[in-house]
């Protein structure tokens, strides 16, 4: 019997994993300069957390969650997203009492959704996201958007489009809800069963329908921006003003609602405009969620965040032809000829590694030519050849692989010599 990875998952092999590490390093450095501290939450949570936090009418909750009962009869779910989990941790650990607000958090880890597999979308996928909880200042909205843009631009992407919208406050959404009901209700039988279920629970979700997106009523649906209260309109204007100050280009799309129920006020997506990217262009999505903390059992504290898929980021890099610098960083490859030389190679390998020098040696007792080819394939900066002569002289032949220059260096001076050259 042969085994393969489960449908919708993938193995990330050497050669690819270095690209992941490079992207992750870029992300961690950006979080450092923006001061978003990492939080690590469980990969499974109580199922009710997502039903309450993400929204019972969303596709995520109704169709895409991996839910199971543990041996104690508790319903648990592999996290389909991480905002709800981070907010749960924020409430549970009373982070709202921290002296410095807002609390700025970042996360990076696997999420799970039962989705149809397609390019850049998996049932287990890695998501990076940030949450800024504790401020309703439009400037923090702009900061969160700027951070997301920085991730893509620092990775080397250029073909990007930022789309923003405002979902307004509760009064805005209540008025808009009434208008949507009047618009869709007479013709709701023409829509899919999901939309029919959403009509009374959350008609805004109809605008996010993937089945009936081309229905004529979708194009004539009342835009939420037409119902913004004076306060909501002023807030959105400030967000746009801060983005202008930061030199960030954006497009306002009044139909952008996102697929999760907790959003209000600012919502945004970053898309790839690369010609080879494919049909699904969204790379990142986020927005403000001023009622979520209270919904999950905490105080009335505002928040904003986003999440992006690492898989889709890598796909966008490929579409634009961007090559990440993933050099192996191998400092030394030791070539040993004979058992005595191999004993010395083992000793030197350990010594070099202890001094922070990335070192490799041969473990197949191959001929010198084969070992030299391995050193070249691995991108070694230096090779050290050990044989009978070198052992007798207590000195090694050190070759700089790029220039071809070769020097004889005493064993006792090898660490100093290599450290100075690296």
UniProtKB/Swiss-Prot annotation:
List, in alphabetical order, the Gene Ontology terms for molecular function in this entry. Answer: ATP binding; catalytic activity, acting on a protein; histidine-tRNA ligase activity; transferase activity
EC class:
ligase
Q: Which reaction does it catalyse?
A: tRNA(His) + L-histidine + ATP = L-histidyl-tRNA(His) + AMP + diphosphate + H(+)
> Record's superkingdom?
Bacteria
Q: Which UniProt keywords apply?
A: Aminoacyl-tRNA synthetase, ATP-binding, Cytoplasm, Ligase, Nucleotide-binding, Protein biosynthesis
What are the GO cellular component annotations? cytoplasm
Looking up PROSITE patterns in the UniProt record yields: AA_TRNA_LIGASE_II
Q: Where in the cell is it found?
A: Cytoplasm
Q: EC number(s) on record? A: 6.1.1.21
**Pfam families reported for this sequence:** HGTP_anticodon (PF03129), tRNA-synt_His (PF13393)
Family membership: Belongs to the class-II aminoacyl-tRNA synthetase family.
- Subunit structure and binding partners: Homodimer.
| Protein name as annotated | Histidine--tRNA ligase
What organism, scientifically named, is this protein from?
A: Lysinibacillus sphaericus (strain C3-41)
């Amino acid at each position: 019997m042969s085994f393969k990875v489960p449908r919708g998952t993938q193995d990330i092999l050497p050669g690819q994993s270095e690209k992941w590490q490079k992207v992750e390093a870029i992300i961690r450095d950006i979080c450092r300069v923006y001061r978003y501290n990492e939080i690590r939450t469980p990969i499974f949570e109580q199922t009710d957390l997502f039903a309450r936090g993400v929204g019972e009418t969303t596709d995520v909750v109704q169709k895409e969650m991996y839910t199971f009962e543990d041996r104690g009869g508790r319903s648990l779910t592999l996290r389909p997203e991480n905002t709800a989990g981070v907010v749960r941790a924020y409430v549970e650990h009373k982070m709202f009492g921290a002296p410095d607000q807002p609390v700025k958090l970042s996360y990076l880890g696997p999420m799970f959704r039962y989705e149809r597999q397609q390019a850049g979308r998996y049932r287990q996928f890695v998501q990076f996201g940030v949450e800024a909880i504790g401020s309703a200042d439009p400037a923090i909205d702009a900061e969160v958007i700027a951070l997301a843009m920085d991730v893509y631009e620092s990775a080397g992407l250029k073909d990007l489009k930022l789309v923003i919208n405002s979902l307004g406050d509760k009064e805005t959404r209540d008025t808009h809800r009434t208008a949507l009901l009047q618009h869709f209700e007479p013709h709701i039988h023409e829509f899919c069963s999901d939309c029919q279920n959403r009509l009374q629970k959350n008609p805004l979700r109809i605008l996010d329908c993937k089945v009936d997106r081309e229905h004529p009523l979708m194009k004539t649906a009342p835009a939420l921006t037409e119902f913004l209260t004076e306060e909501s309109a002023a807030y959105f204007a400030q967000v746009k003003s801060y983005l202008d100050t930061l030199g960030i280009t954006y497009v306002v799309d009044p139909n952008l609602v996102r697929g999760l129920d907790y959003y209000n006020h600012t919502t945004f997506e970053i898309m790839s405009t690369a010609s080879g990217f494919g049909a699904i262009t969204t790379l990142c999505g986020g927005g403000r969620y001023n009622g979520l903390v209270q919904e999950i059992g905490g105080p009335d504290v505002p928040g904003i965040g986003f999440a992006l898929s690492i898989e889709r980021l890598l796909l966008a890099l490929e579409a634009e032809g961007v090559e990440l610098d993933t050099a192996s960083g191998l400092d030394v490859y030791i070539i040993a000829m004979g058992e005595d030389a191999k004993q010395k190679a083992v000793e030197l390998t350990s010594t070099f590694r202890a001094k922070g020098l990335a070192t490799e040696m041969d473990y197949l007792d191959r001929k010198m030519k084969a070992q030299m080819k391995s050193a070249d394939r691995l991108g070694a900066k230096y090779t050290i050849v050990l044989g009978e002569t070198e052992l007798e002289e207590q000195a090694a032949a050190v070759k700089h692989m790029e220039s071809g220059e070769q020097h004889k260096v005493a064993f006792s001076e090898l660490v100093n010599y290599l450290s100075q050259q690296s």
